């Protein structure tokens, strides 16, 4: 394992599929007698050759027809896809007759790159079911290679090998391969981000998987929120019940934070600012979602803003960043987006939490839209919401759990008070908990609002990746009619 690369453990569940059957053409060898005249031999050999050629051509035609049929039943057509890459064999079928297909999603985040390999089964005339997921991740994120693009290819190839090992060979050429980059690349200068994406696309094009012109892109914040909403509602079963109740989602990443839910109140739709509503079509139904991503309000970017720094820029003249959210005696260094900052606390004229809350409120002022309907919608929260809650014992670190929004404030006050006299190994804990507490209240959540915090539902990670590949495959099916 090369230095600087750290892998997460993979997770697999078993699946069943039938190996593709051999073609219907069976040739039988029989011995041709050498007795007889030379004339008989001259006729027999050419005749046998012709029969063999006929059988071979017929087999090839049958093989291509079934492969093409399988390809279109999985993904109708991707714009710019390499059409020579149809599946070698018919679509896999589980023992119960359900169709089997795969999707690969690369999540290029601000702190690392992760590959998700999904296997789906689809009962006849029903919505698909996720039956298998494998993921692995490596650090750092793609943005770390902004000044040395060639180095980014090695990690991408290593993660592609994970997909090759997990997906049966006969499915490779019909399996969509997609990379979506999030806040890490959004914050890079446009030219640097595009060079990274072009390098990844080149690596993808050389892979054996199905690659379209849109296989590599920077995901806008709204789509990130929508994809996470799909994941949560797919895993909870809400998408399988037309008109059934749905749940909202809260995602707190390093560079951005998202909120998404399905409004049931007309007033929410009318009061939403431009860009906060998006139409989503899934399973032949259309959903009008409230979804928005706040770039710069992810936990790491918020830290920098609270410290008084500027994204992507070192402190002027190496100046130390001083914050009321740190222990008064703290001095140290903090690295963010490949920039190292010198940071320190300051003497407190009041309680640490009180001063920190005032500073966080300044950062959040007029940055977040508040909606009343969130009070009445069940919400799942994950990513840094989960990590922070688990870190201070509000939920079980492995199983997750439920809490009320006010628990974050209680934890923040306790940690901040402790830091005033006993500097801890987590110098940013007071700042982070205070930030999350006030962010949730800015969204409109009362302190008594219950949130469900989880990393997994039915042993599947609650990230946007599942929703994104699911939506991608669904859109491919709509772009190409069966008759084409």
From Swiss-Prot:
Modification after translation: The secreted form may be produced by intracellular processing.
Chief location of this protein within or outside the cell: Golgi
This enzyme's EC code(s): 3.6.1.6
UniProt keyword annotations, A-Z: Calcium, Cell membrane, Disulfide bond, Glycoprotein, Golgi apparatus, Hydrolase, Magnesium, Membrane, Secreted, Signal-anchor, Transmembrane, Transmembrane helix
Tissue: Expressed in most tissues, but predominantly in heart.
Entry annotated with the keyword Transmembrane: yes
GO molecular function terms listed in the Swiss-Prot or TrEMBL record: CDP phosphatase activity; GDP phosphatase activity; guanosine-5'-triphosphate,3'-diphosphate diphosphatase activity; IDP phosphatase activity; nucleoside diphosphate phosphatase activity; ribonucleoside triphosphate phosphatase activity; UDP phosphatase activity
Function: Catalyzes the hydrolysis of nucleoside triphosphates and diphosphates in a calcium- or magnesium-dependent manner. Has a strong preference for nucleoside diphosphates, preferentially hydrolyzes GDP, IDP, and UDP, with slower hydrolysis of CDP, ITP, GTP, CTP, ADP, and UTP and virtually no hydrolysis of ATP. The membrane bound form might support glycosylation reactions in the Golgi apparatus and, when released from cells, might catalyze the hydrolysis of extracellular nucleotides.
Family recorded in the similarity comment: Belongs to the GDA1/CD39 NTPase family.
Official protein name in the record: Ectonucleoside triphosphate diphosphohydrolase 6
Lineage, opening ranks: Eukaryota, Metazoa, Chordata, Craniata, Vertebrata
Protein encoded by which gene: ENTPD6
